[in-house]
Amino acid sequence: MTDTLNRRAAMALGLASAAGAALATPALSQDAAPATVRNNVSGFQMHAWRDHFDSLGKPMLVADTFSRALHYWNAEGGDHRIFPTSVPISDDLTKRGYTEIVRKKEGPSWTPTPSQMARYPDWKPIGPGPDNPLGTHAMYLSWPAYIIHGTHDTRKIGRRSSDGCIGLYNEMIAELFQLCPVGTRVRVI
């Protein structure tokens, strides 16, 4: 009986020591191995509006595809908000540069792009609702087929998962939708 208790005590002490060592080990930094990180990563790098736009007067958005975050500044530059996003799945699908919001739609319909139809000929347009890939709100950019929109599939946020669009949680696109009028300046980097 004493041997059994001693073995159990030794095992408990060993497990406690291992747990303590694990807690004392520092976590790996996000930049330790960026090539191996595949899921839900966002560095939320800080940006200043002056680094992207010459003047104030209209709200501004910077979609940072590297850190997978969308930065918003109001027309005065004082209100800065950061939203986690999904970004295009590849650099080939990522259009970078300056554009603006040209149209907004609450409860948007989705239509596959020509390139999506070539890859997936059975895909059909989807009206508003829980199956719609654009989520609850969409802000259309001056570039054809590029949209800042919501998503019902929250697993996509923080990942490279779109065919060119910038996706946000539905709650966050609803907030941004109210802040950004047509004419809001947008830069995708």
Swiss-Prot record:
Domain L,D-TPase catalytic span(s) in chain numbering: 59-189
Active site: 149, 165
Superkingdom in the source lineage: Bacteria
Keywords: Cell shape, Cell wall biogenesis/degradation, Glycosyltransferase, Hydrolase, Peptidoglycan synthesis, Signal, Transferase
Pfam family, one: YkuD
Name of this chain's protein: Putative L,D-transpeptidase in ATP synthase subunits region ORF 5
Transmembrane parts of this sequence: none
Upper classification of the organism: Bacteria, Pseudomonadati, Pseudomonadota, Alphaproteobacteria, Rhodobacterales
Span of the signal peptide: 1-35
